[in-house]
């Protein structure tokens, strides 16, 4: 049972050395982290994550065993042919890694005073730039045929944008097109995107503040879907942004303000 990130090249290599495709099961768990090693392992890594399997021509007993393992680890089985798999992961995994690394590369040599101005937008877009070079050199090289047309289109789109930077209408259309693309990403548990309220809360940068905030959430009986934390350089405060339903956001805002917390107005967006 194979769990590598690229399927076609591995299948070809296996056939080249004379191993029957009937006893080789190509799979790929779509779960991982930007850091590696046993110390980075998580017991819940595969839970509710897609696990791709190409069972074409594979022995039924081996397929059954693979399905049982995937189910045991809590993942969601997705049947997909190896060629389609490589094209799909080139778009949703490999191209994002390349673009994130390219963006982070632009920061090299930048003045520290500039970098001190960065917020969650920059950190979010370069997070996976911290990935392991030795792993990604193999992934990108192995799937280069699927990556090249995507990267070429990305470069072409960037060059087109470069020629339109003084055209406000074109820039607006460019940003709107990105909004449409982002909206295509499935929401929680693979379902439809939901509208969340993002509630910013200023907290003191001292021990126990985050735990105290979560205690207040429990008291208010609200469900926190996600959160982000920002630290301002040179400041003794941090900004916690909680993602909640509109109803829970209103409830928590009232509750926290009554308790003396510094709560800003919530903003809504679809996730």
Predicted feature locations:
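Short, well-ordered coil/turn elements that cap or connect secondary structure elements
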Residues: 19-21, 72, 219, 258
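A conserved regulatory-domain signal marking ACT and ACT-like small-molecule sensing domains
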Residues: 181-271
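Short, conserved loop/helix-junction motifs that constitute active-site signature segments
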Residues: 17-19, 44-47
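Rossmann-like NAD(P)(H) cofactor-binding subdomain of soluble oxidoreductases
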Residues: 1-38
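Internal alpha-helical scaffold of NAD(P)-dependent oxidoreductase catalytic cores
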Residues: 45-130
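Interdomain hinge/lid region at the active-site interface
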Residues: 111-179, 196-199
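Generic structural signal for residues in well-ordered beta-strands
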Residues: 24, 77-78, 263
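Short, ordered loop/turn segments at secondary-structure junctions
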Residues: 29-30, 58, 82-83, 229-230, ...
């Amino acid at each position: 049972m194979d769990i590598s990130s690229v399927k076609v090249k591995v299948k070809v290599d296996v056939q080249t050395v004379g191993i029957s495709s009937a006893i080789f099961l190509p799979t790929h768990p779509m779960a991982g982290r930007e850091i590696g090693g046993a110390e980075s392992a998580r017991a819940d890594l595969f839970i509710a994550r897609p696990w791709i399997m190409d069972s074409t021509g594979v022995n039924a007993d081996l397929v059954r065993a693979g399905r049982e393992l995937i189910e045991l680890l809590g993942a969601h089985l997705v049947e997909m042919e190896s060629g389609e798999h490589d094209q799909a992961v080139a778009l949703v995994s490999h191209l994002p890694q390349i673009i994130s690394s390219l963006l982070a590369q632009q920061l090299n040599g930048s003045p520290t005073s500039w970098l001190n101005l960065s917020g969650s937008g920059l950190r979010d877009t370069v997070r996976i730039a911290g990935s392991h070079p030795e792993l990604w050199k193999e992934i990108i090289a192995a799937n280069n045929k699927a990556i090249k047309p995507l990267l070429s289109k990305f470069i072409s789109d960037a060059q087109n944008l470069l020629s339109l930077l003084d055209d406000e209408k074109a820039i607006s259309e460019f940003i709107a097109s990105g909004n449409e693309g982002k909206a295509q990403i499935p929401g929680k548990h693979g379902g439809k995107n939901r509208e969340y309220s993002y509630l910013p809360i200023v907290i003191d940068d001292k021990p126990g503040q985050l735990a105290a905030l979560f205690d207040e959430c429990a008291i208010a009986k609200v469900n926190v879907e996600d959160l982000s934390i920002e630290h301002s350089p040179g400041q003794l405060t941090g900004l916690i942004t909680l993602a909640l339903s509109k109803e829970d956001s209103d409830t928590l805002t009232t509750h926290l303000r009554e308790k003396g917390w510094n709560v800003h107005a919530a903003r809504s967006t679809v996730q």
